[in-house]
Swiss-Prot record:
It holds the Pfam family adh_short_C2. It catalyses: a 2,3-saturated acyl-[ACP] + NAD(+) = a (2E)-enoyl-[ACP] + NADH + H(+). The active site is at 147 (proton acceptor), 157 (proton acceptor). CDD domains: ENR_SDR. Homotetramer. This is Enoyl-[acyl-carrier-protein] reductase [NADH] FabI. Its EC number is 1.3.1.9.
Length: 261
């Protein structure tokens, strides 16, 4: 029996089999969890439903996190199928493509800043607020996906780094707020992975190569490795952990200097 047997988990942000969210979903299902999913636009519904079916789920709901009405509707609909919620995965991030290349100050705009923060950062407390009644008193857990650009200046990551910094603050505040209700909240800072979302960052291939050459493991991490970490953080095995950011990056974040060898 898997360590997530009987757990009910809602996963956001799964848009392809290369998505980190897919790696998380697969790991959770392998450990016995029941899953539900969201999609953001109608053209993705069929694709997400197909992947959900492969993971033994028929629970797929539309949710544009820029809309409080859609967020609230997801949990209203989910409540018709489940009596509660044990896990929530926030795998959501977006910034206009033109803001993810070149000079930071030249690329940033008020509109790009607001969009990146609304979708990538505000969406975590917005989802947690709506999920709270279903998660309360169940030893439940929230996991959100971040990146090293939250705390380091990564070329071309630009405004998304600011949004991820805000997300990580949101993880800590959410953990502090919900702990007394038996709800934990943690983050995973994953190393760069070639996903559809990552393709919007300029020179991403160079970033992948640099990280693989300079982290202690001398390779990039996989969605399976991130998925296994998320499954642990969503389980009772991690019951004493909340408000933390766990790095799954092959050790790249420990480096003071990037040297060959």
């Amino acid at each position: 029996m898997g360590f997530l047997q009987g757990k009910k988990i809602l996963i956001t942000g799964m848009i392809s089999e290369r998505s980190i969210a897919y790696g998380i979903a697969k790991a959770c299902r392998e450990q016995g969890a029941e899953l539900a999913f969201t999609y953001v636009v109608d053209k993705l519904e069929e694709r997400v439903r197909k992947m959900a079916a492969e993971l033994d789920s028929e629970l797929v709901f539309r949710c544009d996190v820029a809309s409080d009405d859609e967020i609230n509707q997801v949990f209203a609909d989910l409540g018709k199928h489940w009596d509660g919620l044990d896990g929530l995965v926030h795998s959501i991030g977006f910034a206009p493509k033109e803001a993810l290349s070149g000079d930071f100050l030249d690329s940033i705009s008020r509109e790009a800043f607001n969009t990146a923060h609304e979708i990538s950062a505000y969406s975590l407390p917005a989802l947690a607020k709506a999920a709270r009644p279903m998660m309360r008193g169940r030893n439940s857990a929230i996991v959100a996906l971040s990146y090293l650009g939250a705390v380091r200046a990564i070329p071309n990551y630009n405004v998304m780094g600011m949004a991820k910094a805000s997300l990580e603050a949101g993880i800590r505040f959410t953990a502090a707020c919900l702990g007394k209700e038996g709800i934990r909240c943690n983050g995973i800072s994953a190393g760069p992975i070639k996903t559809l979302a990552a393709s919007g960052i300029a020179d991403f291939g160079k970033l992948l190569g640099h990280v693989a050459a300079h982290n202690p493991l001398r390779r990039n991490v996989t969605i399976e490795e991130v998925g296994n970490t998320a499954a642990f953080l969503l389980s009772d095995l991690s019951s004493g952990i909340t408000g933390e950011i766990t790095y799954v990056d092959g050790g790249y974040s420990i480096n003071a200097l990037s040297t060959e060898g």
